[in-house]
């Protein structure tokens, strides 16, 4: 079997670490996640984010999950400054870094 590092995220603010691979978000509040730099030795780095809020009615209104580039960097996510993954119930996003300031959805 293959296992990947999994983090059950409940705080409303988090900076992804070098150990993170899969981040499951169970908080019912709005969540801001900061990505590591897409330029510092991260070519090919993969991160997976999954809304695991456990209620069938979906996330409460106003409780977006925002994925943000590294603070103080010029990094982009799909050419944008931030990415909201909570547009649907139980939404997810997988990102990879090109090692040159960009994160891409796949």
Model features per residue range: what roles?
Residues 88-101:
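Extracellular disulfide-bonded cysteine-rich modules/repeats
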């Amino acid at each position: 079997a293959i296992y990947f590092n999994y983090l059950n995220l409940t705080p409303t603010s988090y900076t992804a670490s070098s150990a993170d691979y899969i981040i499951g978000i169970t908080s019912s509040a709005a969540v801001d996640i900061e990505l590591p730099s897409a330029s510092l030795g991260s070519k090919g780095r993969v991160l997976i984010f999954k809304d695991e809020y456990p209620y069938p009615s979906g996330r409460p209104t106003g409780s977006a999950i925002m994925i943000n580039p590294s603070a103080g960097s010029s990094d982009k996510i799909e050419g944008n400054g931030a990415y909201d993954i909570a547009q649907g119930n139980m939404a997810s996003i997988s990102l990879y870094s090109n090692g040159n300031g960009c994160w891409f959805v796949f």
